[in-house]
């Protein structure tokens, strides 16, 4: 079984989201062993689409040449059995690196198709887990990042999504370690 870990965390040495995500993956591994592939988006330096790169990609799409390297992230995402995305709550959603990554995996013909009956997802994953931390005491429902990822997952054919979060970490007097432990404990019971 292949687990794809999309790591959109920055300041990785001190990232609370990354700490929580590593704990979540460890708990998953205890239940079912996975071959984990981690993509550190900050290191990948994926460029946003431009007129030139989009036109080149669309030309390949029209020819059905999905084996080209430009689609490697999309194929990797499609072929994963389980997906974990770790992204801190920034500007009501997630870091720009994750948005750029999504632009590179959102490919008609690789991760989904449009038919006369609507979209059909092509991804193998049975579940996508979104891991995040928030400084404020906001609920998952207020996290536009998770909501966006959940909608995309359904489009790609991934019916089960979950958000594992720790909130209120920057509230004055918050016990950050306790909040992270509580989130991990709650995730372990799922």
Walk through the language-model features, giving the residues of each:
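Structured loop/turn residues at beta-strand edges in well-structured enzyme cores
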Residues: 78, 96, 123, 156-159
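Short, glycine-/small-residue-rich phosphate/pyrophosphate-handling segment
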Residues: 114-156
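N-terminal beta1-alpha1-beta2 submodule of the flavodoxin-like/Rossmannoid cofactor-binding fold
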Residues: 1-103, 107, 185-190
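Short histidine/acidic/glycine/proline-rich micro-motifs that form metal-
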Residues: 10-14, 135-139, 170-171
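Residues at the starts of beta-strands that form the adenosine-phosphate
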Residues: 2, 35, 126-128, 160
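Glycine-rich phosphate/pyrophosphate-binding loop and the adjoining helix
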Residues: 26, 139-190
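Conserved nucleotide-sugar donor-interacting segment of glycosyltransferase catalytic cores
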Residues: 105-117
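Hydrophobic residues at beta-strand termini and immediately following loops
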Residues: 39, 131, 164
